[in-house]
C-alpha cells in the first residue's frame, strides 16, 4: 500500500463521520417535530461508529506502512471507546428528556453506543494485525508467542460478546415490558443493533485468533455463518414488520432493520476475507470489497425511494434519513475491508 492510498482509506471514515455529524445536526436543527428529533440524533451518532472505524483503519494501515508506534497502540482504541461512552451518555440524556420521540431516539442512540464499543474492540484486536500474514504462512499452525495470549484473546472476545448480550437483553426488555408502540419501534431497532454487535463478535474473534495463530480451519465457516445469519434475521424481521404493520405508522421500522441487515452483510465481507486467506490462496480476495459497496448503494437507493414516499406519508421521513447514514457506515466498511485485503495480500 502506497502512502497516497493509505491516506485515502483513512480519509473515507473521517469523511463519512463528518457527513453523519453535519447531516444529523442539520436535520435536528431544521425543525421541532418528532420525526426530526428522532432522525437527527440517530444520524448524528452514526458518526461515532465511523470514528471508531477510522481508529480500526488507522491501526491497521500504520502497521502496513511501518509508522505504527507504541502511543498509537493505545491512542486509537481509547478514542473509539471514548466516543462509545459519549454516545451512551447522550442516549441516556435523551431518554431522560421530554422532547417528542425521546423514548425511541434515546434507546437507539444508546444502541449505537454499543456498536461503537464493539468497533473499538475490533480496533483493539487489530493492534497486532501485522502478525496475521505471518501466522497464515506458518504451515505448523503453531501459536505465535508475539501474538495475544490466550487470556488477552479471550478477553477481547468476551468484551464484544458481553456488549452483544447487553443489546439482546435490552431488546427483550423493550419488547416484554413495553406498553406503547414506541417500545415496539425501539425494541425492533435494538434487535437489529444486537445483530450488528453479534456480527462484530465474529470479526473480533477472527482478528484476535488469527493474530495469535490459534484460528482453526473449522472456524472459517463458523464465524462467516454467524454474520450471515445475523444479517438474515434482521432482514426477515424487517420484512415482517413492514407487512405486518402495513397500515400502521410504525411499519417504517422495518426499513431501518433492513438497513441494519445490510450493515451486518457489510461486516461479513471482512470475516469472509479473513477466512478465505487463512492458510490458503484466494485469487478473488480483491473482489470482496465489492460487498460493502453494493450494500452502501442498496442503502442509498432504498433511501431515495423513501425520500419520495415521505412526500405522501410522513412515516417514511425517519428511515429515509437513517438509511442515508447507514450508507455512510457501509461505505466506511468498504475502506476497512480494502485495508484488510491489502494487508493480507500475498502479492
Give a label for each model feature.
Residues 2, 66-72, 211-220:
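Short juxtamembrane and helix-loop transition motifs at transmembrane-helix boundaries
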Residues 1-3, 135-139, 340-347:
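Short, charged juxtamembrane terminal tails flanking transmembrane helices
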Residues 1-8, 143-151, 217-218, 283-285:
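Short, Lys/Arg-rich N-terminal segment immediately upstream of the first membrane anchor
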Residues 132-148, 215, 280:
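Membrane-interfacial, low-structure loops and terminal tails that flank and connect transmembrane helices
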Amino acid at each position: 500500500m502506497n502512502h497516497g492510498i493509505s491516506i485515502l482509506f483513512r480519509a473515507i471514515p473521517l469523511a463519512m463521520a463528518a457527513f453523519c455529524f453535519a447531516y444529523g445536526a442539520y436535520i435536528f436543527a431544521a425543525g421541532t417535530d418528532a420525526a426530526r428529533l428522532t432522525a437527527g440524533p440517530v444520524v448524528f451518532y452514526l458518526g461515532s461508529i465511523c470514528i471508531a472505524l477510522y481508529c480500526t483503519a488507522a491501526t491497521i494501515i500504520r502497521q502496513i506502512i511501518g509508522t505504527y508506534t507504541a502511543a498509537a497502540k493505545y491512542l486509537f482504541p481509547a478514542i473509539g471507546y471514548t466516543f462509545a461512552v459519549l454516545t451512551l451518555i447522550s442516549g441516556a440524556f435523551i431518554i431522560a428528556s421530554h422532547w417528542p420521540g425521546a423514548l425511541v431516539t434515546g434507546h437507539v442512540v444508546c444502541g449505537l453506543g454499543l456498536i461503537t464499543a464493539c468497533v473499538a474492540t475490533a480496533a483493539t484486536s487489530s493492534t497486532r494485525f501485522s502478525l496475521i500474514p505471518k501466522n497464515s504462512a506458518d504451515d505448523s499452525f503453531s501459536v505465535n508467542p508475539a501474538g495475544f495470549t490466550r487470556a488477552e484473546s479471550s478477553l477481547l472476545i468476551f468484551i464484544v460478546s458481553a456488549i452483544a448480550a447487553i443489546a439482546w437483553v435490552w431488546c427483550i426488555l423493550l419488547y416484554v415490558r413495553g406498553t406503547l408502540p414506541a417500545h415496539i419501534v425501539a425494541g425492533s431497532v435494538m434487535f437489529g443493533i444486537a445483530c450488528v454487535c453479534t456480527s462484530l463478535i465474529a470479526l473480533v474473534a477472527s482478528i484476535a485468533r488469527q493474530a495469535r495463530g490459534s484460528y482453526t480451519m473449522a472456524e472459517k465457516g463458523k464465524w462467516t455463518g454467524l454474520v450471515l445469519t445475523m444479517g438474515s434475521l434482521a432482514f426477515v424481521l424487517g420484512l415482517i414488520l413492514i407487512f405486518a404493520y402495513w397500515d400502521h405508522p410504525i411499519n417504517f421500522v422495518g426499513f431501518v432493520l433492513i438497513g441494519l441487515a445490510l450493515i451486518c452483510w457489510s461486516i461479513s465481507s471482512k470475516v469472509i476475507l479473513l477466512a478465505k486467506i487463512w492458510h490458503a490462496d484466494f485469487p478473488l480476495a480483491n473482489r470482496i470489497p465489492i460487498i460493502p459497496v453494493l450494500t452502501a448503494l442498496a442503502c442509498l437507493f432504498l433511501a431515495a425511494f423513501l425520500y419520495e414516499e415521505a412526500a405522501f406519508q410522513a412515516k417514511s421521513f425517519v428511515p429515509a434519513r437513517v438509511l442515508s447514514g447507514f450508507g455512510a457506515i457501509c461505505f466506511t466498511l468498504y475502506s476497512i475491508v480494502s485495508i484488510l485485503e491489502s494487508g493480507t495480500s500475498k502479492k
